[in-house]
Design a protein with these regions (language model features):
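Glycine-rich phosphate/pyrophosphate-handling loop used in enzymes and phosphotransfer proteins
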Residues: 1-207, 212-259
């Protein structure tokens, strides 16, 4: 059933009578307020300017046609993503996806009761044929953050979301604190496409929550292209910014939870 179908929205509306909608970045109760007033200024400060595109001199893009992220992985954005991952907050992943749809593709949202719903942006599919989320890590979280983030994107762009198009050949290995060379080795051959018909001949929009070095997105892209995808562009809510691409043996500490 469609996430934004009337029956599902009614059920979520009833739930919000007991558990009101909260800000995905600071956990403040929002109810029907579209944007958290406490986080608005910091979110604007964390916007990547002048553009969202990732530079190949700072990230490993592999065979990607490109990659983009609207925020730096700092401050309330970092806290919001970590909260979504580690505090059983699947609803927050959808809210993060709304921000991605708005900032990356210009989708406005309207409030349906106390729930924000993304508007379809005419002509903004930008040639993408489908959306594929980076698959879950294999940990017992019960939900996949990139998949839930992709729900508002699919509605805004009017293209199908294929949540099972990519799978893992093995559980995700620990990446936090590892240098780039080891990260790349960890994800080599880690992804597969169970049903190649979903992506064959298609331009894929790959969705993740954070792009750090780009190793994971590049490994996903390799699997998608091997399955017959025409091209892959990666998008994430946030990225770690480096002044220059880190040395292959330089440890990176950006992903450790700090709560």
């Amino acid at each position: 059933m469609d996430y934004y179908s009337v029956p599902r929205r009614i059920l979520r509306g009833a739930r919000q009578l007991v558990y009101p909608r909260r800000c995905p970045f600071c956990d403040r109760v929002l109810g029907s307020v579209p944007v958290c007033p406490d986080c608005a200024a910091e979110l604007e400060e964390l916007r990547r300017k002048p553009g969202m595109r990732l530079d190949a001199s700072q990230h490993y893009l592999g065979e990607l046609t490109g990659a983009a992220a609207p925020f730096r992985y700092e401050g309330c954005v970092r806290r919001g993503i970590l909260h979504t991952k580690y505090h059983a907050a699947p609803w927050a992943a959808v809210e993060l996806g709304l921000w991605l749809a708005k900032l990356a593709f210009g989708s406005e949202m309207h409030m349906a009761g106390a729930e924000p719903v993304p508007e379809l942006v005419e002509g903004m599919s930008l040639g993408y044929d489908c959306i594929v989320p980076v698959p879950a890590s294999g940990r017992a979280r019960g939900y996949n953050v990139p998949q839930l983030m992709a729900v508002p994107l699919a509605r805004a762009l009017g293209i199908p979301l294929y949540p099972k198009a990519l799978g893992r050949t093995r559980a995700k290995r620990h990446q936090a604190g590892l240098p780039f060379e080891q990260r790349l080795a960890n994800v080599a051959g880690a992804f597969r496409v169970p049903d190649t018909e979903l992506v064959e001949g298609r331009k894929v929009l790959l969705v993740d929550d954070v792009i750090t070095t780009g190793a994971t997105a590049a490994a996903c892209t390799q699997a998608l292209l091997a399955a017959g995808a025409e091209s892959v562009f990666a998008i994430a809510l946030a990225t770690v910014e480096f002044e220059m691409f880190p040395a292959r043996d330089q440890p990176l500490q950006e992903n450790e939870p700090d709560f």
